[in-house]
A protein has these predicted regions:
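Bacterial N-terminal signal peptides that target proteins for export
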Residues: 2-16
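Catalytic cores of secreted or luminal carbohydrate-active enzymes
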Residues: 352-402
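Short, conserved catalytic-motif segment at the N-terminal edge
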Residues: 35-95, 115-117, 124, 177-178
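Bacterial N-terminal signal peptides
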Residues: 15-25
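Boundary at the C-terminal end of the N-terminal hydrophobic targeting segment
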Residues: 30-34
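Short, glycine/proline-biased beta-turn/loop segments that scaffold the active-site neighborhood
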Residues: 118-132, 223
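Peripheral terminal and inter-domain segments
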Residues: 382-726
């Protein structure tokens, strides 16, 4: 019965969306064609130049569309600092998760062709897909596109490499086969990269074509998107904007999750996709999608799921982050938005179908999709003024806390305690010097660190710090307690709120087995040699800690941020259920016995104990790669020179005692200098192969630090490794 009610409600919503799309196409064209946007462009250019200067980014590019016109296209900064070359309209940027829009279009193309049904089980098309939770059979194609599959989140192992890794899709399938669902399929929408990676498997199974080939044939070619490509092979120098750390160019970034985040494109090319969507599926005389499919993409997919605090910031459509773009919704204008963030690139893609406007921006770090979306809000609001649809651009709201009101003991007690999300463990405590105030502390490898203090209840019902417009309140839903965050968003003219963290209650104290693992470290062994896991600042170390003051939890990860509940001596289980983004990217720790050692699987990455790493002795050392072909780690007790023989090894990396990369190479024989005691050598090679490492200690070299010191060092802060956020 519930299914039939949901189906009728969804059909009614899509029918309404279809009417809106068709009316927008008919009504908006004349106004868009007649408008002079000189004022919009003048203001937007000044804002873009200010954003470039404030962010310190090397470059970015944008496009503004009205109706069928590409009204404004401009680039800023330098695509190549070494040659002072500016980007041009054809310079490609990684667009991160904006790639999901292509995956959605590809899927809806198959729906229009009658090859795929959105609400059919995914296993109908990809029978090789499986998970440990039997409910995986309930996952539909739609759930892959609206983030409601219940998947843990993202397979980060081998996600970012220097060269394309064609085995990533199979690796995701293999990883899902040994994972559990975090929620019942369809129960709540939580941002999920792996769902879109599964679209690659869907396209391959249904069409016999690779995903990249299908998108090229069915989307890029019909739309004339000639400067859009997946990084399957190297790009010619000068065709893409380089990302930098300081003034040092980064290797070209390759995200192996093609459908979820791997595309390189330009704002000009993406503006063609935007015009197709604004036109209800047609562009340049070619119909790519039916109007019904475009309307389905733009319909709110979260209205029937568990979503106790709807947020315009995250109101998922099919592919879209929000089908009520908050900056436009604040002035009564409909909009769809998708953002993309990876390690090196950022993008924002906004379409206002009723107003017949669109804005696309792409850039390099340290920009963000949020800053580019905010720029887009500014441009589109000014464009609405130029159209006559708005009298004036809305003024930013005052950035100040509302007046204080007295909090009851119950209101204070509801806020206090421990809270968690996928990347945060938070403690809220009464302020020592004010019984009406609260302090926030975040758990780090160095213990509790204060993040906010003196928060008091205000007249809006939330706790704010003095001078802050951001406020916090509690709510109970689905049998769980949440801390909600309210804030002023985007261009500063609207308020929004979302569920931030979930209450953590005391659990059964940790067993002796888990207690023995606290404070220890493990090292990754099964990534591709050019994986970003092994690069500077990568999550090469896995550490385990507890939550001081709260029994029954371990915090796990490269930076000890995700709380887990051990359910037995070998499994640290995920448990968070926060709609939106708060429980995205969950992973479980599975302890596996390797001889006398405990190794840990975290997602698709396998870690070996750091404390039992073999040491290289002076003279010749034979290193043999095991039957699994895992990488081999060795410690260096003293400073000295290492010579790695020809044969056996294929790649090497040298790390200092704090796991910073000192060097890497793939040419042999290799001569490597370890400048101090306590360095680490990482070797890659074929299963069963052997190589010889000859160590010549430096004169007067001192012995390295012992294992206990190494474990202590593992708990110190390390460079942040930025994973693709959306």
């Amino acid at each position: 019965m519930r299914h039939h009610i949901a189906t009728r409600a969804r059909r009614a919503l899509v029918a309404l969306a279809l009417v809106i799309v068709l009316l927008a196409v008919m009504a908006g064209t004349a106004a868009a064609r007649a408008t002079d946007y000189a004022a919009t462009i003048k203001d937007g250019r000044a804002a873009a130049q200010a954003l470039l200067a404030q962010s310190g980014a090397a470059s970015f590019s944008l496009a503004f569309v009205s109706g069928e016109r590409l009204v404004w296209q401009e680039t800023f900064g330098e695509a190549d600092k070494a040659t002072s070359t500016p980007p041009d309209a054809d310079t490609m940027y990684g667009i991160g998760s904006v790639s999901k829009m292509l995956a959605t279009v590809a899927t809806m193309k198959l729906v229009d062709q009658g090859e795929v049904e959105l609400d059919a089980p995914f296993t109908r098309y990809v029978p090789a897909f499986s998970m440990l939770s039997p409910a995986y059979r309930q996952i539909t194609v739609r759930m892959m596109l609206d983030h409601s599959s219940g998947f843990p989140g993202s397979t980060y192992g081998d996600l970012v490499t220097d060269t394309y890794f064609p085995g990533y899709l199979q690796q995701v399938l293999d990883t899902l086969a040994m994972e559990r669902l975090k929620t019942t399929p369809g129960y709540m929408s939580v941002y999920c990269n792996d769902g879109f990676t599964m679209i690659e498997a869907l396209v391959l199974a249904v069409t016999g074509k690779s995903y990249a080939a299908f998108v090229q044939d069915e989307v890029f070619t019909p739309l004339g998107m000639e400067h859009s490509a997946y990084p399957l092979t190297p790009f010619p120098d000068g065709t893409y904007a380089k990302a930098y750390r300081g003034d040092v160019a980064r290797p070209r970034e390759v995200l192996n999750m093609l459908a979820s985040g791997g595309l390189y494109s330009t704002p000009s090319d993406m503006s063609r996709l935007a015009r197709m969507l604004m036109n209800g599926g047609a562009y340049g005389g070619t119909r790519l999608l039916s109007a019904a499919s475009v309307a389905e993409m733009g319909a709110d997919q979260t209205f029937l799921s568990f979503n106790p605090l709807p947020s315009n910031m995250l109101r998922y459509g099919l592919g879209w982050d929000s089908v009520t773009e908050p900056g436009l919704a604040a002035v009564g204008v409909g909009g769809w938005v998708k953002g993309g963030d990876s390690v090196d690139y950022h993008a924002s893609f906004t379409v206002a179908p009723q107003a017949r406007l669109a804005f696309v921006a792409t850039g390099v770090a340290p920009l963000s999709s949020t800053s580019l979306q905010t720029l887009g809000q500014r441009v589109l609001l000014h464009a609405l003024v130029d159209q006559g649809a708005l009298r004036r651009v809305p003024r930013p709201l005052p950035v100040a806390a509302p007046p204080v009101k007295r909090a009851s003991a119950a209101q204070l007690a509801a806020m206090e305690g421990y809270w968690g999300s996928f990347n945060t463990v938070l403690r809220v405590s009464a302020s020592a010097d004010d019984p009406q105030a609260l302090d926030f502390f975040q758990l780090t490898a160095n213990g509790w660190v204060p993040t906010a203090s003196g928060l008091r209840l205000r007249t809006d019902g939330r706790f704010h710090a003095d001078g802050s417009a951001s406020g916090y309140s509690t709510m109970t839903a689905g049998g769980r307690r949440y801390l909600a965050a309210g804030f002023i968003g985007g261009y500063g003219h609207y308020r929004d709120a979302l569920l931030w963290v979930q209450k953590l209650a005391p659990e059964t104290p940790l067993s002796a087995a888990w207690q023995s693992r606290l404070g220890k470290a493990w090292l990754a062994v099964n990534e591709q040699p050019d994986s970003a896991v092994y690069a500077e600042g990568g999550p090469v170390l896995l550490t385990l800690g507890d939550v001081p003051g709260l029994p029954g939890y371990v915090v796990s990860g490269p930076y000890e941020t995700q709380p887990l509940i051990p359910v037995d001596d070998t499994l640290g289980a995920m448990f968070l259920q926060i709609p939106g983004v708060g429980s995205r990217d969950l992973e479980e720790d599975l302890v596996e016995q390797h001889g006398s050692e405990e190794w840990i699987w975290r997602g698709s990455t396998l870690y070996r104990p750091q404390a039992t790493m073999p040491a290289l002795a002076a003279g010749a050392n034979t290193v043999t790669f095991g039957a699994e072909g895992y990488a081999e780690w060795r410690s260096l007790p003293a400073a000295g020179t290492l010579t790695i023989a020809v044969g056996g090894a294929t790649t090497w990396r040298l790390y200092d005692p704090d796991m910073a990369v000192l060097g890497a190479g793939a040419t042999f024989p290799a001569t490597v200098t370890a400048p101090q005691a306590g360095c680490y050598l990482l070797l890659f090679g074929p299963a069963g192969a052997s190589t010889t490492v000859t160590v010549a200690p430096a004169a007067g070299a001192q012995p390295g630090r012992d294992a206990a010191t190494a474990e202590k060092r593992a708990a110190t802060p390390r460079p942040t490794y930025v994973v693709p956020l959306r």
